[in-house]
Design a protein with these regions (language model features):
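Catalytic-site signature of metal-activated, phosphate-bearing donor transferases
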Residues: 65-70, 94-207
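Active-site nucleotide-sugar/metal-binding loop of Leloir-type enzymes
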Residues: 70-83
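Short beta-strand-to-loop acidic/aromatic patch adjacent to the donor-nucleotide binding site
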Residues: 80-94
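A short, glycine-/small-residue-rich helix N-cap motif at loop->alpha-helix starts
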Residues: 15, 60-69
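Cell-envelope/extracellular polymer assembly enzymes that use nucleotide-activated donors
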Residues: 3-5
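A conserved acidic beta->alpha catalytic loop
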Residues: 35-45, 61-62
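Short, well-formed alpha-helical segments that are part of the catalytic scaffolds
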Residues: 10-27
C-alpha cells in the first residue's frame, strides 16, 4: 500500500483528537503534529499514539496560517511519504475508509494527484448531520500525491490577516486541474454544539 503521512495543525482539541487519530491509525504510517499552544490535554493524548512521530509545539506566536502550514509540510515531507493527508483535530474519518481509500489511490485513480473528501457536519447529536444548504455540499481538499512533484512545495501567503484562508494544497502542486471527489467521508465536529459554533464565529470575527 502507498505510504500516507498525516499532518495536523491543532490547538485545544482534546475533545475530539483521540477519535480523529484513531480513525486514521490503520491508514497512515506516521503522523506529524503542529500544536499551537494548547492549554488542555491535546498534546498528552497525541503522545499516546505510536503513529505520532513528531509534535512541534509553539507558544505565543502571532497567528500565521501560511507559516504553520509550511512548517508542517516540511515535517511531513521529511518522512518521505507517497501521499499527505491533512486533517483538523475535530475531523474523524468514517470507519469504512481504509479499503475504499487505497483502492481509489492505487487502482481507480493512479495518475490523479489531488483528492477531496466529503464532510458530514455533526450537529447537536452524535448520529445527526446537517445536510441543508451549504452543509450538503461540503467537499474538502484533504489528500495529495507526492510523485513527480516539485521539491520546493510551499504554501503562499494571503491578503487576509494572519494569512488566513490559506490554500488547502501547496500552491505550486502539480495537477490542480484534476481533482477527484473521493467516496471517503469524514465527520466534522467543529459545529457540534452551540458553544463550539459561537467560538468559531468569534474566532472568524477576529480575523
Amino acid at each position: 500500500n502507498s505510504r500516507i503521512i498525516a499532518m495536523y495543525r491543532i490547538k485545544n482539541e482534546s475533545r475530539w483528537i483521540k477519535q480523529s487519530l484513531q480513525s486514521i491509525s490503520d491508514i497512515c504510517e506516521e503522523i506529524v503534529i503542529l500544536d499551537d499552544g494548547s492549554t488542555d490535554d491535546t498534546v498528552k493524548i497525541c503522545e499516546n499514539f505510536p503513529q505520532v512521530v513528531e509534535i512541534h509545539s509553539q507558544k505565543e506566536l502571532p497567528f500565521d496560517e501560511t507559516r504553520d502550514k509550511n512548517n508542517l509540510l516540511k515535517m511531513a515531507l521529511s518522512r518521505n511519504p507517497d501521499f499527505i493527508l491533512t486533517l483538523d483535530g475535530d475531523e474523524v474519518l468514517m470507519s469504512n475508509s481504509k479499503q475504499r481509500l487505497f483502492y481509489e489511490l492505487n487502482v481507480l485513480y493512479p495518475n490523479v494527484n489531488l483528492f477531496q473528501l466529503k464532510a458530514l457536519c455533526v450537529w447537536d447529536k452524535p448520529n445527526q448531520y446537517r445536510c441543508d444548504g451549504v452543509y450538503n455540499t461540503t467537499w474538502s481538499k484533504k489528500l495529495f500525491r507526492l510523485k513527480d512533484q516539485p521539491k520546493n512545495l510551499q504554501f503562499k501567503g494571503t491578503d487576509f490577516p494572519g494569512n488566513s484562508h490559506c490554500s488547502a494544497f501547496p500552491d505550486n502542486l502539480i495537477g490542480k486541474n484534476e481533482i477527484v471527489r473521493s467516496k471517503v467521508k469524514f465527520l466534522h465536529y467543529g459545529y457540534y454544539d452551540e458553544k463550539l459554533r459561537r467560538k468559531k464565529y468569534e474566532f472568524l470575527q477576529k480575523l
